[in-house]
C-alpha cells in the first residue's frame, strides 16, 4: 500500500496566507469521484469535475476512487489527462497525497487528500479483508496556517460488506488510538458504505467523534445516488473541532459528474482559537 505526497505549484493566489484567511472556518469536502466518470461510466467527466471542485473551492478534499493510472482509458479517451487524477485535480491549487489501494496490470486507484495547507506527513494503511475488494485508509497531517496543532485527516473508503467494514473500522480505531490520542484535532471523511449507520455507534463511542450533520439534530445525510440521494453512504466525522455548517451537493451538475453526492462541512477549532 503506497502513499504518494505531492507538491503544490506556487502562484499568486496561494502565496499569502493572511490572518483574515486563518480566521475563517476551514471548508472540507468528501467526494467519491467514481474514477472521473459519470454514473454507469457513460462519460468521462474528470475535466468537469476539476471545474466543479475549483468553483466549490474547499480547503481540504477527501477523495475516493481516484484513478492513479489506467492505460486502457488513456488509450481509449483522447482527452484523458496525462497526470494521475489527484495531480490533475490539485494542479496549482492544492497540495496532494495519494494512496493506491487496488492495483492491476493496466493501472491502480485509491484515495487522495488535497489540501490548501501543507501536508506534513502521509501514510496509507492497508485494511483489506477480502482480496477482491482491496481497501485502504489514507492518513495525513495537515498544518493550517495559524493553527497551534496540525489536523489529523483520514480519507476512508470502506467495504461493501458489513463484516469487512467492522474489521476496517476496528483497524482505524486501533491505529488512531496510537497516533492521534484524545485532544488531537481529527477529521475522518469518506465513503463508508454505511447505509445501516453502524459507523456512528462504533466511531462515536470509541473515538469520541461527532458526525457533521448530527450536530444540527439531523441524521447523516443521504448521498447516493447523486441524482436523487436515497442511501446514507458518505460521512464526515470530527473530534476536537467545531462544525459551523454542513451541506450536501447533489442533483444538477453534481449528478452528471459522479454517482455519489459530495458532502461539505465548515470547521473551526473547538476552543474558538487557532
How should these model regions be labeled?
Residues 81-96:
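Charged, glycine-enriched surface loops/patches
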Residues 9-60, 92-98, 103-274:
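Active-site regions of metal-assisted phosphoester/phosphodiester hydrolases
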Residues 38-43, 70-82:
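Short, flexible/disordered intra-domain loops and linkers
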Residues 67-69, 195:
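Short "lid" loop at the C-terminus of a central beta-strand within the Rossmann-like core
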Amino acid at each position: 500500500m503506497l502513499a504518494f505526497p505531492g507538491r503544490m505549484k506556487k502562484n499568486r493566489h496561494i502565496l499569502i496566507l493572511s490572518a483574515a484567511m486563518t480566521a475563517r472556518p476551514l471548508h472540507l469536502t468528501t467526494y467519491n469521484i467514481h474514477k472521473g466518470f459519470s454514473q454507469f461510466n457513460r462519460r468521462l467527466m474528470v475535466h468537469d469535475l476539476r471545474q466543479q471542485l475549483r468553483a466549490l473551492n474547499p480547503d481540504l478534499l477527501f477523495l475516493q476512487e481516484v484513478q492513479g493510472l489506467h492505460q486502457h482509458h488513456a488509450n481509449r479517451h483522447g482527452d484523458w489527462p496525462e497526470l494521475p487524477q489527484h495531480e490533475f485535480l490539485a494542479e496549482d491549487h492544492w497540495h496532494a497525497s495519494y494512496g493506491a489501494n487496488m492495483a492491476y496490470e493496466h493501472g491502480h486507484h485509491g484515495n487522495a487528500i488535497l489540501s490548501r495547507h501543507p501536508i506534513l506527513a502521509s501514510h496509507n494503511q492497508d485494511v483489506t479483508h477480502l482480496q477482491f475488494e482491496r481497501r485502504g485508509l489514507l492518513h495525513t497531517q495537515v498544518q493550517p496556517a495559524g493553527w497551534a496543532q496540525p489536523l489529523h485527516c483520514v480519507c476512508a473508503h470502506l467495504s461493501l460488506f458489513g463484516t469487512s467494514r467492522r474489521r476496517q473500522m476496528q483497524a482505524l480505531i486501533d491505529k488512531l488510538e496510537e497516533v492521534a490520542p484524545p485532544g488531537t484535532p481529527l477529521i475522518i471523511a469518506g465513503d463508508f458504505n454505511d447505509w445501516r449507520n453502524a459507523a456512528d455507534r462504533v466511531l462515536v463511542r470509541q473515538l469520541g467523534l461527532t458526525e457533521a450533520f448530527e450536530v444540527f439534530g439531523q441524521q447523516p445525510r443521504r448521498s447516493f445516488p447523486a441524482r436523487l440521494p436515497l442511501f446514507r453512504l458518505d460521512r464526515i466525522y470530527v473530534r476536537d473541532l467545531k462544525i459551523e455548517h454542513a451541506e450536501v451537493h447533489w442533483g444538477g451538475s453534481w449528478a452528471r459528474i459522479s454517482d455519489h453526492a459530495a458532502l461539505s462541512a465548515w470547521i473551526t477549532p473547538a476552543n474558538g482559537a487557532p
